[in-house]
Swiss-Prot record:
Location(s) in or outside the cell: Cytoplasm
GO CC entries: cytosol
Protein name: Ribosomal protein uS12 methylthiotransferase RimO
Keywords of the record: 4Fe-4S, Cytoplasm, Iron, Iron-sulfur, Metal-binding, S-adenosyl-L-methionine, Transferase
Family: Belongs to the methylthiotransferase family. RimO subfamily.
Length: 439
């Protein structure tokens, strides 16, 4: 059977998609890039917030149109939306032939076989309690780079978030298992591993009180052929001195940290159940900049949380201005069904949320531009990912994470190989991107 995929949401979901693709290929199916050629399509959904749910449902309904044209026979909804709503999705969307949760994505082949025999399938567990995935993956990332999901689930209880109720409690993967997967990825030509989880810094907390992340990073650093290790989704509360030391002293661990702070007002952070305050964030950032040379910091902030007054927004704005993050993502609070924050008083109007988000993003745009301008006339190692034209390639430096940050456009008269590193002279800036030359 020809099977196509639509993968929505975060990088963790992308990894699940890659595991499902490999499992189906192993079972004898063909993975196709064109949905028009597919007999069956799997839409791997996101159920984190309402806009993501709406995008997922829209993708399912749009794909269902292919069934009416006769080119598509079967349609499966997988991922967080399916895990969250289960059989309700089957009832609401009659075009669906199956709903598949997140508890064991490598078992997708059995579900596909049941659907092919005419059964409508709902395959979910109430709350996943184990981490099952140990199989191979078909990579969907650009050459040279891959995500490594080190754990599943989350033990935090942020008041705006429903992920623990969907993905379950924290389940860390064994270090040997991760090292084996990393070795497989290196054999496929991977040179950068991007470590992801719901909470990367909490890796190992379900096994012992101490984070096992420093040990994992040191072991990964011993692998021949691996050049970059990048850390994403670090919680400010668990960023220990041991983690900082590894980032500072292990050459393969990039001086790049993605630390979503969500807010800088102690009042709002308390309402969010983040368990740290403004003072903790200031101390953390000062320590990081003092101990890690050439550090790149990325963060995420939320605007319009219930009870966010002008003074709270002003505190966040001032904090962003002072902290000088290299990259920043911003999104407006959504009162998510099932979250504690949805029931809080003093909900903020959408117009005010949008205004505050726009102000923060305009501030960050100026900061990022100034930081990029300061990089002109420096030389950086660039991982080449694609080619735009005969003399123009696209890649990333250590200070640019895949999918979320800017890129580096490389001008050259040479033929560069995708997935290779080259030393590039940075000569200009275009929006959020760098312009470089390779001679």
């Amino acid at each position: 059977m020809n099977i196509g995929f639509i993968s929505l949401g975060c990088s963790k979901n992308r990894v699940d998609t890659e595991v499902m693709m490999a499992a189906l290929k192993k079972a004898g199916h063909r993975i196709v890039n064109s949905l028009e050629r597919a007999d069956l399509v799997v839409v791997n959904t996101c159920g984190f917030i309402t806009p993501a749910k709406e995008e997922s449902i829209e993708a399912i309904i749009e794909t269902a149109e292919l069934k009416k044209k006769g080119s598509l026979q079967f349609l499966i909804a997988a991922g967080c939306l399916s895990q969250r709503y289960g059989r309700e999705l089957l009832l609401e969307i009659p075009e669906l032939d199956g709903v598949f949760g997140i508890s064991s994505v490598s078992s997708i082949a059995g579900v596909v076989n049941r659907i092919a025999q005419g059964e409508r399938v709902c395959f979910t567990e109430a709350t996943p309690t184990e981490y099952f995935e140990k199989g191979h993956r078909i990579l969907t990332t650009p050459p040279g780079s891959a995500y490594l999901k080190i754990s599943e689930g989350c033990n935090n209880s942020c008041s705006y978030c429903v992920i623990p109720s969907i993905r379950g409690k924290l389940r860390s993967r064994q270090i040997n298992e991760l090292l084996n997967e990393a070795a497989q990825l290196l054999k496929m030509g991977i040179k950068e591993l991007v470590l992801v989880a719901q909470d990367t810094s909490a890796y190992g907390h379900d096994i012992s009180p101490q984070s096992a992340l420093p040990t994992l990073l040191r072991e990964l650093s011993k692998l021949d052929g691996l050049e970059w290790i990048r850390l994403m989704y670090l919680h400010p509360l668990y960023l220990s001195d041991d983690i900082i030391d590894v980032v500072a002293y292990e050459n393969k661990v990039l001086p790049y940290l993605d630390i979503p702070i969500q807010h800088a007002s102690s009042k709002i952070l308390k309402l969010m159940h983040r368990r740290h305050d403004n003072s903790h964030l200031r101390t953390m950032i000062s320590k990081l900049r003092a101990r890690i040379p050439n550090l790149t910091l990325r963060t995420t902030v939320m605007l319009g949380f219930p009870g966010e007054e002008e003074k709270d927004f002003a505190e966040l704005y001032e904090f962003v201005a002072e902290s000088q993050f290299d990259w920043l993502g911003a999104f407006s609070f959504v009162p998510e069904e099932g979250s504690k924050a949805a029931l809080l008083p003093n909900q903020i109007e959408d117009e005010i949320k949008a205004e505050r988000k726009d102000k923060i993003l305009r501030l960050q745009q100026k900061i990022t531009r100034q930081k990029n301008l300061a990089r002109i006339n420096t030389q950086e190692k660039v991982l080449i990912s694609s080619q735009l034209s005969k003399n123009l390639f696209v890649g990333r430096t250590y200070f640019q994470a895949p999918e979320v940050d800017g890129l580096t456009l490389v001008k050259t008269d040479f033929k560069l190989t995708k997935g290779d590193f080259v030393d590039v002279q940075l000569v200009g800036v275009r929006n959020y991107d760098m312009i470089g030359e390779y001679q």
